């Protein structure tokens, strides 16, 4: 899967995309992450990407021109893509939506910033997604959340289909308690059923939890 990210702050993604599972998926050629700095597409001499809002209001609004030109350029290859904008008014991301997005061959994610995005630019996108009812500085962190939860659903990224199926929310259930070594620690013991070797009993215990 290819994921293009349109952002004013591409440097925010370097640590996330170059660590852990996402880095391994990138190196293995399973995922293809591409960062696009919206400022590079500004027609302004000073690379401006925002301006005051018509009708007043607090804060600046992202202008449509840099977004349109950036989008136009990265879609020149003709490959179809699902265009997503991170915005507080969008659908709240959950595991069902993540699975839906994981079925796409390519995603393009626009990170909102400032007071919002010019509605003419928003109209170019297929979907609007939020990660919750709270205020963030910009859309970069929501984009990271989308990238992470969608990527781990792509076959081969986790290395095992069972890893994906066992995780919290995969079947509408939260994950069961996990234990590691040692058997006893500070007077706290691992449940006996987990040490029994009886896989059927373990499975029932996990489901009950």
Question: Which residues make up each language-model segment?
Answer:
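N-terminal nucleotide/polyanion-binding subdomain common to many enzyme families
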Residues: 1-74, 195, 200-207
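Hydrophobic/aromatic beta-strand patches that form the interior of the parallel beta-sheet core
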Residues: 4-6, 34-36, 82-84, 107-108, ...
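Short, solvent-exposed amphipathic alpha-helical segments in soluble enzyme
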Residues: 20-24, 99-103, 124-126
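Short glycine-enriched loops at secondary-structure junctions
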Residues: 38-41, 113-117
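Short clusters of hydrophobic/aromatic residues that line enzyme substrate/ligand-binding pockets
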Residues: 49, 54, 93, 101, ...
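S-adenosyl-L-methionine/SAH cofactor-binding core of RNA-modifying enzymes
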Residues: 63-111, 118
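Structured adenosyl-cofactor binding patch, chiefly the S-adenosyl-L-methionine
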Residues: 117-169
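Long, charged alpha-helical interface segments
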Residues: 169-209
């Amino acid at each position: 899967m290819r994921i293009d990210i349109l952002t004013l702050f591409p440097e925010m993604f370097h640590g996330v995309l170059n660590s852990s599972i996402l880095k391994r998926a990138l190196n293995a050629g399973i995922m293809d992450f591409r960062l696009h700095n919206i400022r590079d597409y500004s027609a302004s001499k000073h690379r401006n990407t925002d301006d005051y809002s018509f009708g007043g209001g607090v804060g600046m609004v992202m202008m449509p021109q840099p977004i349109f030109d950036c989008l136009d350029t990265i879609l020149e290859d003709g490959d179809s893509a699902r265009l997503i904008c991170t915005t507080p008014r969008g659908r709240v991301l959950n595991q069902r939506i993540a699975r839906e997005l994981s079925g796409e061959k390519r995603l393009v994610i626009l990170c909102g910033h400032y007071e919002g995005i010019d509605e003419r630019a928003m109209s170019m996108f297929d979907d609007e997604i939020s990660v919750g009812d709270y205020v963030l500085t910009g859309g970069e962190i929501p984009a990271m959340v989308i990238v992470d939860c969608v990527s781990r659903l792509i076959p081969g990224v986790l290395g095992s289909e069972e890893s994906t199926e066992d995780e919290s929310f995969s079947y509408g259930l939260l994950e069961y308690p996990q234990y590691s070594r040692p058997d006893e620690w500070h007077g706290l013991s691992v449940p006996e059923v987990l040490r029994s070797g009886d896989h059927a009993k373990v499975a029932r215990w996990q489901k009950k939890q």
